[in-house]
């Protein structure tokens, strides 16, 4: 069982076929910053056009964490993946739905002001304790640290825009008025406990506020106050949290995870580059590359443990995980918090997901067929399909200097071998 395919043997699918009429299908979306949202939109567009018998705006349940919460809330409100691509990736369409990246990087002026007001009192207290000889330098620094803002950017513009989007005709900002279950996961700052907004007892919070709480990454955005408590990014506690859906008698769960560690040993032609300098090993890229790989590995290890646990606790539920190829230098080289290359990244996610579907076609057919879901082979095999109108080749901060014909041939050969391996596994 691999992280990308948690399905049981084909014989198990056949034995369940008689009891899967009217199968219930759920969608779980992990976080990953702006890069994660962009990747998930591109991947969902590829899945939407390829999977016949499933509507992503009419799933039987949604769970979203952090950036995945934005996407899940939109889908639950009837916004198709293509509509979200138009609004966020291409920035065209109706003004009400248009999502401009500037709303995510508005300075948290009110937070700055509130902390600045504390500074004179903290300085006076520190000076007094130093004069009395009762405080060390470390204690003084810790005390003055209270004046530092808890976030660089403000959540308010994000919440206000989402409230406007979800207040449009046919949509709602109220969990209780949705036709289907939506769960947005945040983390209680004071206890570290999971906050599953949308479940009974947690559904009196506006969807727009729950989304901002779920995506309040400490350091970037201030904690979001709801009632008497403060909440931060749900990814601090969970990577996917698909168990919310598994406990609701869901038969099939589609999971999307945008952040994976990079396998730098796959293709030596993919040389790491920082500016014009070639970096033969990730460690030579310094803190940025090492930190990125470490963060991705930490997040993904939790996901792997969770997926293994789901298979044990819910053996009768099929789970299909979609994520970037661990050997993909484009996704590892992209800035997790960048919006500037969103068209190229979305197109890359769209095309790489289509490749993933082609590689896993037989295994996915065996999983989906008992649930009444088919794969549109003509659509999947159409080489002319594109997601956005303008999609130049993405050039991240580090990349292979000049991918030659041999490199391209090796990548194509790798894809063929992957498909052969998948075919043998399901034969």
What is the meaning of each model-derived region?
Residues 1-65, 73-427:
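Patatin-like phospholipase
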Residues 68:
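Catalytic cores of secreted/periplasmic lytic hydrolases that degrade extracellular macromolecules
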């Amino acid at each position: 069982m691999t992280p990308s395919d948690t399905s049981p043997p084909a014989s198990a699918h056949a034995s369940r076929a008689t009891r899967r009429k009217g199968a219930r299908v759920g969608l779980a979306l992990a976080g990953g910053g702006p890069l994660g949202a962009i990747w998930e939109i591109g991947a969902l567009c590829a899945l939407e056009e390829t999977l016949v018998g499933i509507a992503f705006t009419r799933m039987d349940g949604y769970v979203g964490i952090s950036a995945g919460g934005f996407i899940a809330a939109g889908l639950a409100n009837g916004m198709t993946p293509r509509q979200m691509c138009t609004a966020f990736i291409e920035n065209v369409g109706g003004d009400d739905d248009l999502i401009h990246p500037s709303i995510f990087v508005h300075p948290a002026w009110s937070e700055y002001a509130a902390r600045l007001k504390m500074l004179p009192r903290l300085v006076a207290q520190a000076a007094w304790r130093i004069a009395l000889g009762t405080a060390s330098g470390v204690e003084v620094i810790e005390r003055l640290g209270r004046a530092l803002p808890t976030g660089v950017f403000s959540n308010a513009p994000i919440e206000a825009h989402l409230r406007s989007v979800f207040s449009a005709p046919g949509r709602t900002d109220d969990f209780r008025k949705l036709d289907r279950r939506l769960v947005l996961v945040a983390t209680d700052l004071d206890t570290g406990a999971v906050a599953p907004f949308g479940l009974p007892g947690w559904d009196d919070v506006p969807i727009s506020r729950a989304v901002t709480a779920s995506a309040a990454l400490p350091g970037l955005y201030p904690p979001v106050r709801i009632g008497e408590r403060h909440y931060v990014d749900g990814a601090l506690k969970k990577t996917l949290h698909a168990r919310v859906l598994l406990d609701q008698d869901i038969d099939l769960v589609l999971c999307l995870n945008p952040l994976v560690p990079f396998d730098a040993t796959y293709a030596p032609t993919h040389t790491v580059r920082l500016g014009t300098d070639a970096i033969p090993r990730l460690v030579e890229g310094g803190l940025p590359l090492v930190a990125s790989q470490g963060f991705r590995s930490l997040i993904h290890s939790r996901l792997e443990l969770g997926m293994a646990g789901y298979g044990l606790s819910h053996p009768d539920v099929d789970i299909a995980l979609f994520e970037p190829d661990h050997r993909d230098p484009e996704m590892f080289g992209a800035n997790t918090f960048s919006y500037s290359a969103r068209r190229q990244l979305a197109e890359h996610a769209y095309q790489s997901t289509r490749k993933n579907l082609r590689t896993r076609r037989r295994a996915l057919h065996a999983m989906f067929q008992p649930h009444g879901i088919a794969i549109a082979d003509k659509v999947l095999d159409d080489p002319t399909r594109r997601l956005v109108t303008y999609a130049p080749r993405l050039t991240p901060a580090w990349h292979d200097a000049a991918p030659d014909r041999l490199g391209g041939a090796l990548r194509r050969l790798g894809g063929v071998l992957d498909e052969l391996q998948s075919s043998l596994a399901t034969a």
